[in-house]
């Protein structure tokens, strides 16, 4: 998460340096306005992944989480690629079990619906 933020902050994309500076400033302002520590943002990310994983199988490769500021509002943007939607019965079972959101952040749901570490 922090590496994504730093990558966006210092990326070397082609384009106008004025626009790049503007985008960097927006990212910094978003983090300042949200007043979230990196640890709090990471905990929130893990909890969101845990809840969403109860209902759908996620593709951990394309996941993105970041803060964005626009018009005085700060938003948490989450891009979660979905591999498949779980059957309703499986989703209900996972919801009742109350998965632990403090799992591996790149974890993908296993057959039982619990998060497990991705295979190498």
From Swiss-Prot:
Keywords tagged on the record: Cell cycle, Cell division
Pfam families (alphabetical): MinE (PF03776)
Function: Prevents the cell division inhibition by proteins MinC and MinD at internal division sites while permitting inhibition at polar sites. This ensures cell division at the proper site by restricting the formation of a division septum at the midpoint of the long axis of the cell.
Name assigned to this protein: Cell division topological specificity factor
The organism's place on the tree of life at top rank: Bacteria
NCBIfam families to which the protein is assigned, alphabetical: minE
Signal peptide range: none
